[in-house]
Amino acid sequence: MARHGDTRSPSPVGSTYSSSRRSRRDDDRYERKRDDGRSYRRSRSPERRYRERDRDRDSYRRRDHSVDRRDSHRDEDNYRRRDRSRDRRRSRDRDHDRDYRRRSRSRDRDYRSRRDDSRDRVRRRTDDSADLKRKSRRDDSRDRTRGAEPKSREASTPAIPTRTGPTDDEKRAERLAKLEAWKQKQAAEKERKQKEAEASGGPRNILEEIDRKSGLSPAVSSPQSPATQGVDAAPAAYAGKFDPKAIAKNAAQTPAAPSVLGNDVAVPSSAKTSNAQTARVQASKASGNAPSPAVLKAKGNVGSFGLGTKQVADNEKSIATKTLGFGEEESTRRKLERLPTPPLDDADASKTAETNADDDDDVDMQDGETEEDAAAAARVAAERREERLQNESLTKTTNGNTTAKAEEADKMEVDAQEEELDPLDAFMSELAESAPPKKKAGAKFSKAQEPEAIFGDEHDVSMTAVGEGDAEDFLAIASKAKKKKDIPTVDHNKVEYEPFRRKFYTEPSDLAQMSEEEAANLRLELDGIKVRGLDVPKPVQKWSQCGLGIQTLDVIDKLGFASLTSIQAQAIPAIMSGRDVIGVAKTGSGKTMAFLIPMFRHIKDQRPLENMEGPIGLIMTPTRELATQIHKDCKPFLKALNLRAVCAYGGAPIKDQIAELKRGAEIIVCTPGRMIDLLAANAGRVTNLRRVTYVVLDEADRMFDMGFEPQVMKILSNVRPDRQTVLFSATFPRNMEALARKTLTKPIEIVVGGRSVVAPEITQIVEVCNEEKKFVRLLELLGNLYSTDENEDARSLIFVDRQEAADTLLRELMRKGYPCMSIHGGKDQIDRDSTIEDFKAGIFPVLIATSVAARGLDVKQLKLVVNYDAPNHLEDYVHRAGRTGRAGNTGTAVTFLTEDQERYSVDIAKALKQSGQEVPEAVQKLVDSFLEKVKAGKEKASNSGFGGKGLERLDQERDAARMRERRTYKTGEEGEDEEEKDEKKNEQAEEQFNKVLSAVQSTSAQLPGVPKGIDLDGKITVHKREVDPNAPNNPLDKVGSAVADIHARLSRAGVMRSGVPIDNRGPDAGAFHATLEINDFPQKARWAVTNRTNVAKILEATGTSITTKGSFYPAGKEPGPGENPKLYILVEGETELSVTNAMRELMRLLKEGTIAAVDSESRAPASGRYSVV
């Protein structure tokens, strides 16, 4: 039954919060609940307390499990409440009293007995100082100074000598009698059942003694007879903390207790018993005496009777048994513990208790056995094993931490496994262990736990993964991480691709009946379509003839596409037939829909995408704006067809694009650079091109130009060879066509209206004017456009050739009152996107842009395009002018030419002629003038196409940025790559240094520029100063002239700045001199050898004189007669070695400055376009 002393509270057993602190704060309320109706509250005399103890102890045990047992707790609580008096709080034992109150909450304690026992124990501690340390530890762990008063100690002191003699004799006699009876009973009974041993009347007292030792119940720990008192002396401190001398006093009055076994079995105090047993093991271990193993023996024997076994298995090892598999060990322990040794051990333990008064906590029944030596020897292994388990449970129970218990058991198991595997480790463990059997038991113990070695296995696996790694693998991984991200080359012969369907077009009957002549006439009517190739399908006239699905046709109808454009009529049936197509058509002719609609039909025919599969349709564009526009054109079809598309371009966060690709997308619209980044990201796990069967290159001429061609070819090489490839552009030069045909298979070439022709709906105006008049003319054009109401919502697009010019023109137009914005490659992508959207929405009517907005930009109401700076080739002009006059609308394109831009006039005049417009006379004059210069060899004819700097410049910029980050953050991963790049950079610097390095010149006093020998190897040549033959040979005269010279210099010392060398008037100040020309070095190099800091260091180190002479001349300019020579440095010194060292240092600074200049150029290359300030 649950009592007030129950320890099943939220607070830990060892904490004082739930008892002492609460007792202090809520004294009255708490004691009213616990102490109503209790007696003996006012008695504080020792005599009365002793009488109460003598009278009630035996009766307390007799009614152990009766209802009256609660009264004993109440009596104890009354006594405890008495202790909280004013005098008690002034006592030194105030903290001990709190501990006593805390410990008294356990359910199975005889509090009055413990109170008296604490008094006697304090007295024994005073008498026997040798055992003070051990005694104090037991008091700390279990019941230190449990509220005993000083008066009670004094009263109990004289009673000890009178009780010592008879207690010993009675205990010895009683123990011999019990031993004989127990041996007879054991010989008669050889079964291991516990209840049969308990049912016998002979060993009843033995059971009670054993019960008190195990600490099951306060009732069991009370003495039954004089012989029992002697037995109780050993385990009393553990269960009830009774003094054997105090027990002997009342031995004659104590009757035998009723059936103890049944009561003990019914006691639900397993948790408390486990804690008590753990505390006893700790006390025994702390004492350092031999009885420590005996404690385990006693507990083992108790287990054989069915008392301790249940508690040990259920309480102390419940967690360990479940998690680590102690079942085999437990069965072995029960098998060995049934041997009949407790009486002899207990007798010997009582002798130990007589010798050491404080050893009653540690005395066991098996220390002094005389007849059971063989049985004890057989049980040694099990006892040592039990001791190990108890030591483990001590830490675990005290801390209340099951995780620590599991870890401790795991450590023990790992050690045991090592002992089994390695004899040397076993031997070392044997040396470390105090007893060899303990090691054997541990090894045997670990075998039972091996299947459950969870933590040990995990640690072993992790150590193996790190420790057994091959060094070459790590080096390979490191070198791989250093390499630049690149797409791995795919061997298509080793990859099995899924077959796919290419032909979806079936020629309608009305077109099949059409003859070739009729088809040619139809193509002529459709803006003069020109086709090249084999088996070209006839152009269609209606959407219904294209073989499209109903969903696609519904979207087309909703978009308002009533009829097909010329390029669509010919390109859609050609693409739907599965052929590779090159489509060239004028701007604004619907080329985007010509390749999008067949792509949707192509994708829907294939199986859906699975997890981590790449796209099916790939569309690449040269500009980010064009990619965004194509992606926007796809959206109406995506929802109807249940498809997904991703737009991937640089400038936007790549993580968002990666997330979209991982979710799956059938279509990806991208720029080449970002596509390479995505393919190389995460070692190619983001996306792949295995399922790509439909590739579109929009603005294909730009894609195959020098800037994009390597990237495009790198991507196409990773796509399956039997793909369908489609190329579209408004301009397609012949040289680009030859390059593009390498990627196609038997293509059909479709040209509508000419290869690079401006649409006839566009009015082209070309004017030749000065640079100053261009802005005024621009204001005039804008004023005329927005002067009428019908053009109120019109848009104007102004093209310039440089980023700085765009911002400058923006500022000027804003001052004139025109709301406008600018767009160019120097702006962030988010700014470019928002600017395009605002311009299309009409938020501002004027947009200033570079050629980045020349391709693919489709803006409604765009009626005026102004080429403020003339385009540099034909294709750029066509695309710029093609931003207006789209989809049949009219527009105007105005181009400004200056006198010095005659090389651009040739392409502009050609575009005018091809579009059927007249060439102005001023423009024709510029054309004729340029052609004459070409014939004369003064000029070179310009090639068509955009050209570009290729990937080398991009790689250089990326490498420079990466090196800058490495220097900033010092990642420690520079390694070989950094060394190689440093070598390349040094080589470049050496080349430039050698180009501009002038040899060290030796000069005479009168002619410093002679001789002018150049030493490209950078050898330092030092010349000795020539001696004037007219100079006086008298040493005194030399001294006088030197003194005069010094005075002359000192007189000017105050005039000169600090740190500046004194003017030495040429090479007369030292015996040796040398010169170093620095005029043609970069600015940083010149600054490195002329700034005062560096020069002062050299002067201090070498003792020379360094002077900067001459004048600086720009590159290509030579000094005229009578002018100062080019900038050079004069070094003078008294010894040749000093001059040589100074020159070497100056040349080193020159090299470093040159390298720094090269590095700065590669880090921030002068693009000549735009620089963000």
UniProtKB/Swiss-Prot annotation:
Annotated keywords: ATP-binding, Helicase, Hydrolase, mRNA processing, mRNA splicing, Nucleotide-binding, Nucleus
Q: Which reaction does it catalyse?
A: ATP + H2O = ADP + phosphate + H(+)
Pfam short name (any one): Helicase_C
Q: Where are stretches of biased composition, namely Low complexity?
A: 8-20, 395-404
Query: Residue limits of the Helicase ATP-binding domain?
Result: 572-750
Motif stretch (DEAD box): 698-701
Q: Report the InterPro entries cross-referenced here.
A: DEAD/DEAH_box_helicase_dom (IPR011545), Helicase_ATP-bd (IPR014001), Helicase_C-like (IPR001650), P-loop_NTPase (IPR027417), PRP5/DDX46/KHDC4_KH (IPR056149), RNA-helicase_DEAD-box_CS (IPR000629)
Q: Bias regions of kind Polar residues — which residues?
A: 219-228, 270-290
A molecular function (GO) term: ATP hydrolysis activity
Instruction: Report if keyword Nucleotide-binding is assigned.
Output: yes
State any GO CC term: nucleus
Extent of Acidic residues compositional bias = 356-374
Q: What is known of its domains?
A: The Q motif is unique to and characteristic of the DEAD box family of RNA helicases and controls ATP binding and hydrolysis.
What is this protein's function? ATP-dependent RNA helicase involved spliceosome assembly and in nuclear splicing. Catalyzes an ATP-dependent conformational change of U2 snRNP. Bridges U1 and U2 snRNPs and enables stable U2 snRNP association with intron RNA.
Q: So what family is this one in?
A: Belongs to the DEAD box helicase family. DDX46/PRP5 subfamily.
The identity of this protein, by name, is Pre-mRNA-processing ATP-dependent RNA helicase prp5
**What is the source species?**
Emericella nidulans (strain FGSC A4 / ATCC 38163 / CBS 112.46 / NRRL 194 / M139) (Aspergillus nidulans)
Q: What is the lineage of its organism?
A: Eukaryota, Fungi, Dikarya, Ascomycota, Pezizomycotina
